[in-house]
Amino acid sequence: MVWKPKIPYKVNCFTWLLTKEAVLTQENIKKRKFQLCSRCYLCEEHAETVDHLFLHCKWTDQLWRIFSSLRKITWVKPRNIAQLLNCWTNIGNTTIKEERWRIVPTCIWWTVWKERNQRCFEGKKNNLQNFKMNCIALYYFWCKQKVLVQVKELFDVIDYL
């Protein structure tokens, strides 16, 4: 599930690191004996752990809700990335939908990571609406590269917002 063609190589590498919990969140930097005040750059409420940032943060949750609503599914988010990867592929059904569905976690995670780094290193913050649109645009771009999405479906995504 980690290595996906038509997704940039650096994003595939990032996803692989994420599945190994090796992405340099503040929690992982602290494990290397650096003194930090660990706080999520998105919600500014909780410690920045891999599981919080990429699954449970209220900002990230908005992205998970968009895509789960498109599939009309209700789900309980797993506790960690490994559990998510184990259950995610069981939700898809047809071939094209399955392929589109499989890139959703990577799209969400990459959007979250880009926003986090923009806030951390550049001091720039997108509002929630732009954050969601960045994710949807990225998803559409990746699907379009693989001819997995039609224009009508993009409008369905935007209508949700």
Regions found by a protein language model. Give the residues of each.
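Short flanking/linker segments adjacent to small metal-binding domains or redox-active Cys/His motifs
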Residues: I96-K114, C120, Y160
